[in-house]
Amino acid sequence: AVPELDTDQWLAVIEKCRSAGVTQLTFTGGEPTLRHDLIKLVQAAQWFVTRLNTNGRMLTSMMCKDLRAASLDAVQITFYSAEAEIHNQLVGVDGYNDTLNGIHNALAADLNVSLNTPLCSLNRDYLSVVKLAHTLGIRYLTCSGLIPAGNADTAASRAVRLTPAELEETLRPAMEYAAANGIEISFTSPGWLPEDTLRALGFTQIPSCGA
């Protein structure tokens, strides 16, 4: 396994990114909120547009206030379902309440919050996530297909993967509700649906491979 970089090593990486003219940094993982030095690293990256990708379970009120003070620009929280049982089944732990509390804490700290939902056959009621986001005052959402890669490349994960037709059927009511309520949804899985289908559903940004 590749050893984890310590604080000074990451600070050096951040400085190299600045010197190279990089404009955006995303803190992701794994789970970045497990690092004791996360606030310090975000603070050191203030001249970038900074984002945090997290499961939200460690987002205490104090951490969210500290992230806000460190000038974090946006936090994206992975949220699988508005139903606790389904969310917990997909993440493999009883983490729904912790994640929901993290969302509330991030919003209370006036962080720019978005929700990300990988879609599969178990959480096809994506509309309920969009409705919950609207209730919470969250206006930006992302979703994707379930990508069977790495540890997720199992027969079980491939069995719950949505077909293009199922994915379109899942997205249509969510997109209609979003359009009617001022919510922006981005689909981030390139190649999963034809461009004309995505545009017909109301997506204005078509995902492309960054390779």
Describe the predicted segments one by one.
Residues 1-74:
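Conserved alpha-helical substructure of the radical SAM core
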Residues 69-73, 80, 85-210:
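Radical SAM enzyme [4Fe-4S]-AdoMet core and its adjacent flexible, acidic
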